[in-house]
Amino acid sequence: MAAAAGGGAAPFVWKTYRMVEDPGTDGVIGWGKGNNSFVVADPFVFSQTLLPAHFKHNNFSSFVRQLNTYGFRKVDPDRWEFAHASFLRGQTHLLRNIVRRGSAAAGGGGGGGGGKRRDASADGGGGGGDEDMTMVATEVVRLKQEQRTIDDRVAAMWRRVQETERRPKQMLAFLLKVVGDRDKLHRLVGGGGNGNGAATAAAADNGFADAARAGCGEKRARLLLDGDNTGAFGPDAVDFAGFYTGADMFPDVAVDAAAAAAGGSAGCSFAFGVDSGY
């Protein structure tokens, strides 16, 4: 069906023409400036999307080797641009002239066949060099893709390293701020960071104040109690008459007149001797 649609062209050639002609894939594969070649602008996307859709593989190297067997040549060493004398835009009737080299050599006969064989031999010699160059270029593309992947991974690792280095600095700055902020420190220690830290800190402060006030009250109560006991035994409440008169355990001490005259206090008795001769 594809061969009939392509005017007898080989299925591979016709599928390639359809991919190149599709304007929706110009960012991946499209015609060159002169419409006599096609360019694979993005080999990676081409091998991942278009090749599996049209062929049974996604190997870009296999696709390039297949182009070589049909006589396509790489015309630009710096990009994937291929050309064939019969592969022209809008000239689908020429596609049937693009055949595999082995088929062209085997199908020729007589004198014309000799010329075709010579052409095939020449193409084969040149094709071998082109195939080697294609393999090298394909390997370069693969290495570039791997390099891009490695660069992305390195960039991601570097971002993680920077994040890891930034977190301790942020934690240190936070701790320094907390140490300098008493309310925040109370919230972290007492409130658990649940939004009730200020109330908890205030309650703790009030608790300390209440305990201090309670202690002071108890101390004052003890002082008052001790004061009452001391007042109960004050000078007005104690009878010292027996102490001086000997009514209890202490006998009276007699003082003679001479001693009284020397002491200057007649009629005064003491329970103990008084030395007034200093």
UniProtKB/Swiss-Prot annotation:
InterPro entries recorded: HSF_DNA-bd, WH-like_DNA-bd_sf, WH_DNA-bd_sf
GO molecular function: DNA-binding transcription factor activity; sequence-specific DNA binding
Keyword Nucleus: yes
Positions of the UniProt region annotated as Hydrophobic repeat HR-A/B: 143-179
A GO BP annotation: regulation of transcription by RNA polymerase II
Pfam families the record matches: HSF_DNA-bind (PF00447)
Motif (Nuclear localization signal): 219-222
Location of region: Disordered: 105-132
Keywords, alphabetical: DNA-binding, Nucleus, Phosphoprotein, Stress response, Transcription, Transcription regulation
Record's subcellular location: Nucleus
GO cellular component annotations of the record: nucleus
Biased composition (Gly residues): 105-114
Post-translational modification (record): Exhibits temperature-dependent phosphorylation.
Subunit text: Homotrimer.
Family of this protein: Belongs to the HSF family. Class C subfamily.
Function (record text): Transcriptional regulator that specifically binds DNA of heat shock promoter elements (HSE).
UniProt domain comment: The hydrophobic-rich region (HR-A/B) corresponds to the oligomerization domain.
Protein's name in the database: Heat stress transcription factor C-2b
Top-level taxonomy: Eukaryota, Viridiplantae, Streptophyta, Embryophyta, Tracheophyta
